């Protein structure tokens, strides 16, 4: 073991290897520090012997067999025999269970023994996709007598529930793994829950890599069919070079790759970004005539600073980097477009380069960027310019001819209903959903519940006579709100048996360590109605659907009706409860990071790899925190995380409650989409979000807290998007991309100029209900790409950016002990000025006429 000591002995951190200590020292930019090598002797128990339990660790993993056909009981018995002989020699105990096609294994022993053994296990060609479910210290051996005992599922139990449930949870878990953010995946590999990890400050080199003029590609109707293939190629090129140079992909954002490296990999980062440009150039030269890949160019900005690796959000989560340096990096990447350079980096990055590379760079001047008071000094490598205008001209004059891509995009409405991917929230809109006070409640949103509610409503009261009688199975997991006794379980069984016999529903219910796992099977509509009632039962929470699909025949005989399989089954194989419990917990955690469309498609019994690229019209929403850079530049990283977490939870709650789908969480920015006919719902979500921010400020009005200065602007626009999954090199992204994706960000940005918190474009206004369209919007003097814009009327939805900025300055001044700055005469006048585009109460106006000569209507 190695100890790193700095700050005159005030800061101490331990490491298992010397390399870990050195990397931490370099990444943390610690100059004056000393490293010591120490040996830890095992503790002595009260009986005078060595207490091995003080140095034990337990590791559980899931993997998939590469050849399930050969995994018969004899094959597994031989595997277990060899493992037992080997593991006894090194003092490792545990168990191995196989439920086709998945292996479940737990090993326990010392750190050194487990690291050695698991490295060999991971390299074994008999399995793949080795995913750690749990990994941590333990107080003693739980499986000391097992020693890798063969545990084929058929040898443990003939109960079909075990086989079905283990397969369904393991299959869903394994399929969702590739959609995880890399940082969250690394946490799970260490046996940690990403959502439970505290924020981790770090020094990083951050980049934003742009696919040049990707919006123009999406806007060109001749290239829409190839958009998914272009994105998939971009994802693969970025993943190969970033991860191959020691970096990490943070996220992909509609033709943008955000990545980061430790500071001792700065030169590797710049080389990787240059290699991405070279790889795209090589791909362009190899394409057949008509291929849109020949239009792919990259442009990047790089910056260095302190950031925080943390989990943001709860209902939908993102494990990402937060910090002021992220915003600055984005501004530098935008500046690269203006300076016509493929790679632009800041002075801070230049300082991290070695002498040899530093001599190659040349200055690109000092420039003022949005959100920063001081200008930034930037540098570039000498080389040919990248003229964005030239790329745009190539795209506009490009014709694909007879070229046909490998991933064609299909119009969503042209597909049969049964083949359409579940891209929308199908919750019926007949009755307004109740508004619940607060955000981020404990009850989770279920992956399939919205679709199930719709089915139940369509079924009506006479489901047994006229409803869908397709034989269907559904499996869900949930957490008990309190420990369940035998009497509690007996009461559940009596009620379930009586109720389900009338509906011809069979199944099984498992209760393991506070976890319910239930499988239901029966006529589809009857089962769906029953499931919706089960969800409301106060005896459990966090209800999540794992699997739902039609079946040919029942797995559970009618005479069982509903069978409780608890102690009888688990007594034959005690480790089974650990496997079930850990799988369920990991699945529940994983589901929040994966796009809702993928989760719904997967839990409906489909392979996510079969998701078809589609295009459709949607109402796009974009929102972010006003003056975020000013608010956070003098705040601690923990406060930045707190602000973003609070805001993201509010956004996801409002959006999901109104039937929208969250696309991306980008620091303080959230993007989402609603169905084309969901304009009113999108406006309602925006109003709910802005109201939350106002109530948050009021709650902290008398406290020096950064949350007392949080406000937001919301932009809404309508347009065509392409929805497709991209990537094949171990990282998969489900992308929602279109020209509207970039345009809605511009719509959101003008909220500060026109004085309205919510701004919509003409296409959205045309899709509003008559009442809201004719009496709830006010024209603004601003237009985006020729589209007139409107603000949502109402005094409660006015946005005073000057007041917000003064509040932020006053907060920072008060916290630093300074006197608040006096208002300049011009600023004082602005307090009484009506913001551009805002109408005084009592004034009347009319909606502006669009280019098509649309209606004009009286508004307040």
Curated annotation (Swiss-Prot):
Renumbered residue ranges of the record's region Disordered: 420-443, 819-860
Keywords: ATP-binding, cAMP biosynthesis, Cell projection, Chromophore, Cilium, FAD, Flagellum, Flavoprotein, Lyase, Nucleotide-binding, Photoreceptor protein, Receptor, Repeat, Sensory transduction
Feature: compositional bias, Polar residues: 847-860
Domain Guanylate cyclase: residue ranges: 205-333, 619-748
Extent of the signal sequence: none
GO CC, any one term: motile cilium
Keyword Repeat on entry: yes
Annotated GO MF terms: adenylate cyclase activity; ATP binding; blue light photoreceptor activity; FAD binding; photoreceptor activity
Name used for this protein in its record: Photoactivated adenylate cyclase subunit beta
Organism annotation: Euglena longa (Euglenophycean alga)
């Amino acid at each position: 073991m190695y100890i790193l000591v700095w700050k005159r002995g005030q800061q101490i951190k331990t490491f298992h290897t010397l390399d870990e200590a050195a990397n931490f020292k370099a990444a943390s930019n610690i100059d004056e520090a000393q490293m010591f090598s120490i040996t830890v002797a095992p503790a002595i128990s009260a009986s005078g012997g060595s207490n091995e339990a003080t140095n034990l660790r337990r590791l559980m993993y899931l993997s998939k067999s590469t050849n399930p056909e050969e995994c018969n009981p004899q094959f597994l018995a031989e595997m277990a025999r060899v493992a037992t002989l080997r593991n006894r020699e090194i003092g490792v105990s545990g168990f191995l269970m196989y439920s086709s096609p998945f292996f479940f294994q737990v090993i326990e022993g010392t750190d050194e023994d487990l690291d050695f053994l698991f490295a060999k296990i991971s390299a074994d060609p008999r399995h793949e996709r080795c995913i750690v479910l749990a990994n941590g210290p333990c107080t003693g051996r739980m499986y000391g007598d097992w020693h890798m005992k063969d545990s084929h599922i058929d040898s443990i139990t003939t109960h079909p529930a075990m086989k079905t449930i283990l397969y369904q949870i393991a299959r869903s878990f394994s399929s969702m793994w590739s959609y995880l953010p890399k940082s969250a995946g690394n946490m799970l590999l260490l046996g940690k829950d990403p959502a439970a990890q505290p924020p981790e400050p770090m020094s990083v080199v951050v980049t934003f890599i742009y696919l040049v003029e990707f919006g123009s590609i999406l806007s060109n109707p001749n290239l829409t069919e190839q958009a998914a293939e272009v994105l998939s190629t971009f994802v693969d090129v970025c993943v190969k070079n970033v991860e191959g140079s020691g970096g990490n992909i943070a996220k992909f954002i509609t033709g943008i790759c955000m990545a980061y490296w430790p500071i001792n990999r700065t030169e590797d980062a710049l080389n990787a970004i240059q290699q991405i440009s070279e790889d795209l150039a090589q791909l362009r030269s190899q394409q057949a005539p008509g291929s849109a890949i020949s239009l792919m160019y990259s442009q990047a900005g790089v910056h260095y600073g302190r950031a925080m690796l943390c989990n943001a959000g709860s209902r939908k989560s993102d494990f990402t980097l937060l910090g002021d340096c992220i915003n600055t990096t984005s501004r530098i990447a935008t500046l690269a477009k203006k300076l016509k350079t493929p790679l632009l980096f800041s002075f801070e990055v230049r300082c991290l380069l070695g002498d040899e590379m530093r001599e190659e760079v040349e200055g690109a001047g000092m420039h003022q960027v949005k959100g920063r008071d001081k200008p930034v000094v930037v540098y570039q490598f000498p080389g040919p310019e990248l003229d964005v205008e030239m790329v745009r001209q190539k795209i506009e004059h490009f014709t694909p001819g007879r070229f046909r891509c490998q991933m064609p995009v299909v119009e969503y409405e042209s597909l049969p209903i049964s083949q359409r991917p579940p891209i929308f929230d199908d919750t019926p809109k007949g009755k307004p959903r109740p508004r619940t006070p607060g955000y981020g409640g404990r009850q989770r949103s279920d992956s399939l519940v919205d679709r199930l509610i719709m089915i139940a409503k369509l079924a009506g009261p006479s489901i047994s006579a006229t409803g869908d009688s397709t034989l269907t199975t559904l499996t869900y997991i949930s957490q008990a709100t309190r420990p369940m006794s035998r009497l509690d379980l007996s009461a559940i069984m009596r009620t379930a048996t009586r109720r389900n016999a009338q509906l011809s529903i069979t199944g099984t219910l498992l209760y393991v360590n506070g976890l319910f796992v239930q499988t239901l099977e029966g006529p589809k509509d009857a089962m769906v109605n029953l499931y919706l009632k089960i969800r409301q039962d106060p005896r459990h929470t966090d209800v999540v659907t794992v699997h739902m699909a039609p079946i040919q025949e029942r797995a559970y005989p009618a005479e069982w009706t509903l069978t409780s399989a608890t102690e009888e089954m688990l007594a034959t194989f005690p480790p089974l409860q650990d496997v079930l419990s850990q799988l369920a917990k990991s699945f529940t955690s994983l589901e929040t990071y994966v796009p809702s469309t993928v989760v719904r498609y997967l839990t409906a019994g489909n392979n996510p790899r079969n998701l078809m690229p589609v295009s459709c019209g949607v109402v796009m929403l974009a929102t972010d925190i006003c003056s975020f850079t000013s608010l956070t530049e003098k705040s601690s990283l923990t406060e930045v995380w707190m602000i973003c977490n609070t805001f993201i939870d509010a956004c996801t709650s409002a959006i999901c409650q109104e039937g929208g789908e969250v696309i991306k969480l980008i620091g303080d920015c959230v993007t989402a989409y609603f169905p084309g006919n969901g304009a009113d719902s999108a406006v309602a979500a925006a109003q709910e979000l802005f109201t939350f921010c106002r109530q948050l400020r009021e709650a902290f009005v008398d406290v020096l807290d950064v949350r007392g200065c949080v406000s937001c602007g919301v932009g809404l626009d309508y347009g065509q998007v392409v929805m497709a999954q991209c990537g094949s090199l171990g990282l998969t992204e489900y992308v929602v991309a279109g020209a509207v994706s970039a345009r809605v960000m511009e719509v959101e940005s003008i909220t500060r100029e026109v004085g309205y918190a919510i701004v919509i474009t003409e296409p959205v206004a045309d899709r509003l209900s008559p009442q809201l369209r004719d009496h709830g919007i006010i024209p603004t003097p601003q237009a985006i790409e020729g589209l007139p814009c409107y603000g949502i009327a109402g005094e409660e939805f006015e946005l005073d950016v000057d007041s917000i900025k003064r509040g932020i300055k006053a907060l920072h001044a008060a916290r630093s002990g300074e006197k608040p700055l006096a208002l300049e005469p011009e600023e004082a006048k602005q307090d009484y000025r009506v913001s551009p585009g805002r109408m005084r109460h009592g004034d009347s106006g009319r909606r502006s006429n669009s280019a098509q000569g649309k209606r004009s209507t009286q508004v307040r």
